Amino acid sequence: MKVVFCSSAIIKNKNGEILLISRKQKDSFTNCWEFPGGKLKNNENFAVALFRELKEELNIKIDINKLSNYEFFKHQYRSFLLMMYVFEVTEWTGKIISKEGELLRWVSAKELKKAKLLPANTKVVNYFLK
């Protein structure tokens, strides 16, 4: 069974809203929303991968030394096992824009519980919003 390692972020703004990003149309689970982030590359650790992904996807920089409140999740998909660290991000530099063309959406905790999310992200919501 293939194992995929990734980092994701629960990005919260000053109003407590959480940022979601749409799936690319060419990806599986189209029409779903997910937390920003992505797969690890070239022996990166989870924090470094998150820094790279947020810069690539959203044009923002985070201080990886200030990352806290993180949790590890596993989710079994049909063809692979996802191993994911999820970090809470409340501070960043730069203006959030979609550099890769996906839609961005800020949602309240209530809206997040109703959003059509990737299966692995649903576990994350249940944990962080308990």
Task: Describe the residue ranges of each PLM region.
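Short secondary-structure boundary/capping segments
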Residues: 1, 10, 25-26, 95-98
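NUDIX/MutT-family hydrolases
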Residues: 86-88, 96-128
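Active-site-adjacent beta-strand/loop module that shapes the phosphate/pyrophosphate-binding cleft
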Residues: 4, 13, 71-95, 105
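Flexible, glycine-rich phosphate/dinucleotide-binding loops
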Residues: 18, 27-28, 76, 95, ...
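Conserved N-terminal beta-strand and adjoining loop/helix that marks the start
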Residues: 1-18, 39, 72
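Conserved Nudix-box catalytic region and its N-terminal flanking loop in Nudix hydrolases
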Residues: 17-57
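Short secondary-structure junctions
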Residues: 58-65
